[in-house]
A protein has these predicted regions:
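C-terminal, low-complexity/hydrophilic appendages and adjacent surface loops
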Residues: 1-80, 86, 118
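Long, internal low-complexity/basic segments
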Residues: 47-62, 70, 78-311
Length: 311
């Protein structure tokens, strides 16, 4: 999930290019911490009364602007405030120029990096980087009038264009600015690239094809690509409107949560367990399974007490 930021020392501008992707996707280390598990339980259990504490579990704005002097914790977004419109425009322009001047390669999907050096590739092949950047920036802030741009890009020869076109359509679906799923998007769910196929499926889930989209995310074309679909399914499972459709796959998810690997960040079994936690079908304390708890006890046995902390 690409995110870029810029600051002039006083204000900080953050641009999230896939704003519907929550920050609370679990990784192995952080969610092994008792504090993170308690945070999960507080918010997902419905006990939280502070909106700030729930931010990481929700979709977020495409653009955020913070006054670092008054708000060093970066909690109060000023991007919608008319008073700061000039500051926002200045920071947006600076960041947009920066990704172009540096030829930022962070918007390419993982499969485009296999057996190639992107730095050389985009220069030798004269890749249309500016066209890609335009599409990327449009996707996160998409309006209904942009739908035709995304639909055209769905058929691009470039995998990244197809991917970001799917992101743009997903954003429109989530915002309720597009209700009908373009036929090309449904076709794209069978794209040979799992990142494109799964992002298209995610978009379809918000464009009237919820069952088809979730079915595709839960059933990969290749087993090795299961983690790609599960990652997006974990995002969807934080949306209560999507949970009933995901529950139709509950038996399969529970089976995969037990039989698939769950010892590393991108292990599909760990992702399946995260989805079950979001659905309220598993307690967060069981996310890593009993074997991880026992291993932790074994690794830490005999270590000297850390209270008080060493000087």
């Amino acid at each position: 999930m690409p995110v870029r930021a810029a600051t002039d020392g006083r204000f900080k501008y953050i641009r999230s290019y896939i704003p519907y992707r929550q920050f609370a996707l679990r990784n192995y280390y952080q969610w092994g911490m008792p504090s993170n598990k308690a945070w999960d339980k507080l918010v997902l259990g419905g006990h939280n009364t502070n909106p700030d504490w729930a931010q990481t579990f929700n979709a977020h704005p495409a653009e955020m602007l913070f006054d670092l002097e008054k708000d060093p914790g970066e909690l109060h977004n000023l991007s919608d405030s008319p008073e700061y419109a000039e500051v926002l425009a200045k920071m947006r322009k600076a960041l947009s120029e920066h990704i172009r001047s540096t030829k930022d390669l962070g918007f390419f999907i993982p499969t485009s990096r296999v057996n190639t050096t992107l730095y050389d590739k985009v220069r030798k092949e004269k890749y249309p980087l500016n066209e890609l950047y335009n599409l990327v920036e449009l996707a996160g802030t998409a309006k209904a009038s942009d739908a035709s741009v995304f639909e055209k890009a769905l058929s691009s020869q470039y995998p990244e264009m197809r991917y970001w076109a799917s992101v743009g359509l997903a954003q429109l679906g989530i915002k309720g600015e597009l209700q009908v799923c373009p036929p090309t998007l449904l076709t794209l769910m069978n794209d040979a690239d799992p990142y494109i196929a799964c992002e298209a499926a995610y978009a379809a889930a918000y464009l009237g094809e919820t069952s088809k989209g979730i079915e595709r995310l839960n059933h990969p074309a290749k087993e090795a690509d299961r983690k790609v679909g599960y990652s997006l399914l974990e995002c969807l499972s934080l949306d209560k409107t999507m949970q009933p459709a995901i529950r139709t796959h509950l038996a399969d998810l529970k089976e995969k949560a037990e039989i698939l690997p769950r010892k590393a960040n991108e292990d599909a079994g760990l992702m399946a367990r995260g989805i079950l936690v979001n659905l309220g079908e598993m307690d967060i304390k069981d996310l890593h399974g009993p074997e991880s708890y026992k291993l932790g006890l074994k690794l830490n046995h005999g270590r000297r007490p850390m209270v008080p902390l060493p000087n």
